[in-house]
Amino acid sequence: MTIADSLGEVGETAALARIFPRLPAASAQLLGPGDDSAVIAAPDGRFVVTTDMMIHGPDFRLAWSTPHDLGWKAAASNLSDIAAMGAVPSALVVAIAAPMDSPVTLLEGIADGLRDACEALAPGCGVVGGDLSVSSTLTIAVTAFGDLEGRAPVLRSGAQVGDVVTVAGVLGEAAAGLRLLFERATTDGEPDALLAGELRGEFKHLILAQLAPRPPIGHGVRAAVAGATAMLDLSDGLALDARRLAKASGVALDLDPTAVGSREALDGGEDHSLLATFPADAELPDGFRVIGRVVTGDGILVAGQPYDSAGGWDPYTGWNGAAG
């Protein structure tokens, strides 16, 4: 067997034998990969669970992302959802469907990205199981579990009039990176791997904000302990996600344009930062900064004026069907 063997040539068993050693173990794991199901400790008696899917085309382009990027982003996006509930990420289950002619090294790279993201963003979280299948389109689906450690979950429905609106993490950087890729890493309208590599060298911070984001995972627990009244992961853009929080809480969010910054910060997606509201007299945990206030009404305001831009990312309206 050579390092360039395809999945079709080696089969599932041999592919898994090469992937398993690369995956991180979970601290809460009582029984990991190899049986029909994993067994995970739940000291709190409850667990938080979320799932997210990445599909080649609408969610990523192989010409732009390395396999390591894909594994990292698949982990990071799910870890951020767990953090947004005020929980500690404990375990991931990963399902991958890939074309038959995909090299096994593709899956090894994805596994390495999953491992490195867990170790960097949520130490102690690991991959406890999953599935491999064949498909004409590369698809990565991750289910994440989290431990509330005895606390109540922080919902998106608890914001109160008078609260401050805060964010931990970046705003607009992932959108800026994506804009650069579309503007400068395509040839005849198709993603270009060589140009993307050059961009990665020139604008590394912004490109990685899009392809391999670093959400502030540990800040979710800090926010919960500090008394956050509502919280949510900014996966689809500040304006769109803030509107969701406002609707769930029955309030309006008035955002400060100076604190928010660029239009990309409002309308761009995939930063995976944490949007949280706190009582006005709360001591904000390190890493959170005020970007607005909770007021009566509904929807989103910017400097007191309604902000009606659709903005954000909706996979059913935002994808143009491009390949690459």
What are these regions (language model features)?
Residues 29-34, 39, 131-133, 157, ...:
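Beta-strand->loop->alpha-helix junctions that form or flank phosphate-binding loops
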Residues 2-3, 7, 11, 46, ...:
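Acidic, Ser/Thr/Pro-rich beta/coil linker or hinge segments at domain junctions
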Residues 89-184:
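Glycine-rich anion-binding loops of enzyme active sites
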Residues 48-51, 153-221:
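Short, acidic (Asp/Glu-rich) active-site segment that either coordinates a divalent metal cofactor
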Residues 101-103, 203-270:
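Active-site-proximal betaalpha loop/short-helix elements
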Residues 1-66, 94, 112, 116-119, ...:
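Extreme N-terminal cap/leader segments of soluble proteins
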Residues 67-91, 112-121, 237-244:
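Small-aliphatic-rich amphipathic alpha-helix that forms the alpha element of a beta-alpha
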